[in-house]
């Protein structure tokens, strides 16, 4: 099995239930074992900022799926939970991003690994640092990348 890291986000409806539902779907998928989950974090919107706040989390999984197979599973879980893609960086009931996949560097029209923006987004790095602070992405650890960003406005939800 290969270790991969996923970012979860929601800003429509019952955000906590959406994140929990995504993790449940992942855990029920053959070839995926959820090994760690961060707390949920309340975060301001990024990109298109005229929308509600987000709830974000990170998940570590062990998987037998290929990177593209994992992406397809994530997209199918999003659809099962009601995701409709209307505009880039717009509101979403659930978002599941493949952030990193151990030993894989991918760059094609469907998938870029590691995720091209992972080191630029505190809302991704804060929860990821909770479960994998020493994960190396782009030559630096998650902890080092996070130290370069401003995490203000990001609050852990108890």
Curated annotation (Swiss-Prot):
Q: In which pathway does it act?
A: Cofactor biosynthesis; tetrahydrofolate biosynthesis; 2-amino-4-hydroxy-6-hydroxymethyl-7,8-dihydropteridine diphosphate from 7,8-dihydroneopterin triphosphate: step 4/4
Looking up InterPro entries in the UniProt record yields:
Hppk, Hppk_sf
Q: Which family does it belong to?
A: Belongs to the HPPK family.
Q: Which UniProt keywords apply?
A: ATP-binding, Folate biosynthesis, Kinase, Nucleotide-binding, Transferase
Provide the catalytic activity annotation: 6-hydroxymethyl-7,8-dihydropterin + ATP = (7,8-dihydropterin-6-yl)methyl diphosphate + AMP + H(+)
The GO terms this record gives for MF are: 2-amino-4-hydroxy-6-hydroxymethyldihydropteridine diphosphokinase activity; ATP binding; kinase activity
The Gene Ontology biological process annotation of the record reads:
folic acid biosynthetic process; tetrahydrofolate biosynthetic process
Pfam families in the cross-refs:
HPPK
Signal peptide residues are: none
What SUPFAM superfamilies has UniProt attached to this entry?
Answer: 6-hydroxymethyl-7,8-dihydropterin pyrophosphokinase, HPPK (SSF55083)
PROSITE patterns linked:
HPPK (PS00794)
Stated EC number for the protein is 2.7.6.3
What is the role of this chain? Answer: Catalyzes the transfer of pyrophosphate from adenosine triphosphate (ATP) to 6-hydroxymethyl-7,8-dihydropterin, an enzymatic step in folate biosynthesis pathway.
- List, alphabetically, the PANTHER family matched: 2-AMINO-4-HYDROXY-6-HYDROXYMETHYLDIHYDROPTERIDINE PYROPHOSPHOKINASE (PTHR43071:SF1)
Q: What name does UniProt use for this protein?
A: 2-amino-4-hydroxy-6-hydroxymethyldihydropteridine pyrophosphokinase
């Amino acid at each position: 099995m290969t270790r991969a890291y996923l970012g979860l986000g929601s800003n429509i409806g019952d955000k906590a239930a959406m994140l929990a539902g995504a993790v449940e779907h992942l855990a029920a998928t053959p070839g995926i074992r959820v090994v760690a989950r961060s707390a949920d974090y309340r975060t301001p919107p990024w990109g298109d900022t005229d929308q509600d706040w987000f709830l974000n989390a990170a998940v570590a999984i062990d998987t037998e799926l290929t990177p593209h197979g994992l992406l397809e599973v994530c997209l199918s879980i999003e659809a099962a939970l009601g995701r409709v893609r209307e505009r880039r960086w717009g509101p979403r009931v659930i978002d599941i991003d493949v952030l990193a996949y151990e030993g894989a560097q991918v760059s094609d029209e469907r998938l870029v690994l590691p995720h091209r923006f992972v080191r630029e987004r505190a809302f991704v790095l804060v929860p990821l640092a909770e479960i994998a602070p020493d994960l190396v992405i782009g030559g630096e650890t998650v902890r080092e990348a996070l130290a370069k960003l401003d995490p203000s406005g990001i609050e852990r939800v108890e």
